[in-house]
Swiss-Prot record:
Database matches in InterPro entries: Maize_Zein_Storage (IPR052508), Zein (IPR002530)
Protein name: 22 kDa alpha-zein 4
Top-level taxon of origin: Eukaryota
Subunit structure: Interacts with OP10 (via N-terminus).
A single GO molecular function term of this UniProt record: nutrient reservoir activity
Cleaved signal peptide residues: 1-21
Keywords of this entry: Seed storage protein, Signal, Storage protein
Further comment: The alpha zeins of 19 kDa and 22 kDa account for 70% of the total zein fraction. They are encoded by a large multigene family.
Tissue expression notes: Expressed in endosperm, mainly in the peripheral regions.
Organism annotation: Zea mays
Purpose of the protein: Zeins are major seed storage proteins.
Protein family per UniProt: Belongs to the zein family.
Annotated S-S bridges: none
Length: 266
């Protein structure tokens, strides 16, 4: 009899604990409709467990993401890939030129890289065109610096002090590059003066446009040589008088045999 009473009390205790207990899914993938079947009405209304709240929030976020059209997401990804492809193609177009410039003149390469972030270059392309033209003469100036550093330094000093360089730097640099063939032209003067005069015409654009600026340029370039050597001064004066001397144009060989006015040779 006592055993029956104890067994009944145990069954009542188990029944009471089963009615008051509720399930808390930790890592369950069951939908919320199934979970609510095991929850008491009081806990589902206002006393829900934090783990269940996090699970329902996760389900709501996943549902909102899945509701977006898949085609819209694909269009966004394709647009991003297209922009990256265009940027890569533009970089590949300039890589050979920039690599060659980096090998020839690293300083000019760094200056070119900084040019993209220059507000003046982005705002005013016309103002940046002389700087782009100067880049064409950098390889020749770099070779001059390697072969003859003293001549390169003298070239830079003349570039900063010459009015022609300030007004038109590309024309000035082109004129300076033409001066590198002066030794060969000097030998041509001795051998054939008429051919020398004909040789100067197609290469000297500054003489055809502005002869006064050309004469001033030659004086500024070769003035240190004229001070050191009177023969050079006489030669320069003869070059200035030659275009205006009719006798020189008729027979340059006999003209060079005549006395040089104001020169050191008679």
């Amino acid at each position: 009899m006592a055993t029956k009473i104890l067994s009944l009390l145990a069954l009542l205790a188990l029944f009471a604990s089963a009615t008051n207990a509720f399930i808390i899914p930790q890592c369950s993938l069951a939908p919320s409709s199934i979970i609510t079947q095991f929850l008491p009405p009081v806990t589902s209304m206002g006393f829900e467990h934090p783990a269940v709240q996090a699970y329902r929030l996760q389900q709501a976020i996943a549902a909102s993401v899945l509701q977006q059209p898949i085609s819209q997401l694909q269009q966004q990804s394709l647009a991003h890939l297209t922009i990256q492809t265009i940027a890569t193609q533009q970089q590949q177009q300039f890589l050979p030129a920039l690599s060659h410039l980096a090998m020839v003149n690293p300083a000019a390469y760094l200056q070119q890289q900084l040019l993209a972030s220059n507000p003046l270059a982005l705002a005013n392309v016309v103002a940046n065109q002389p700087q782009q033209q100067l880049q064409q003469f950098l390889p020749a100036l770099s070779q001059l610096a390697m072969v003859n550093p003293a001549a390169y330094l003298q070239q830079q000093q003349l570039l900063s002090s010459s009015p022609l360089a300030v007004a038109n730097a590309p024309t000035y640099l082109q004129q300076q590059l033409l001066q590198q063939i002066v030794p060969a032209l000097t030998q041509l003067v001795v051998a054939n003066p008429a051919a020398y005069l004909q040789q100067l015409l197609p290469f000297n654009q500054l003489t055809m446009s502005n002869s006064a600026a050309y004469l001033q340029q030659r004086q500024q370039l070769l003035n240190p040589l004229a001070v050191a050597n009177p023969l050079v001064a006489a030669f320069l004066q003869q070059q200035q008088l030659l275009p205006y001397n009719q006798f020189s144009l008729i027979n340059p060989v006999l003209s060079r045999q005549q006395p040089i006015v104001g020169g050191a040779i008679f």
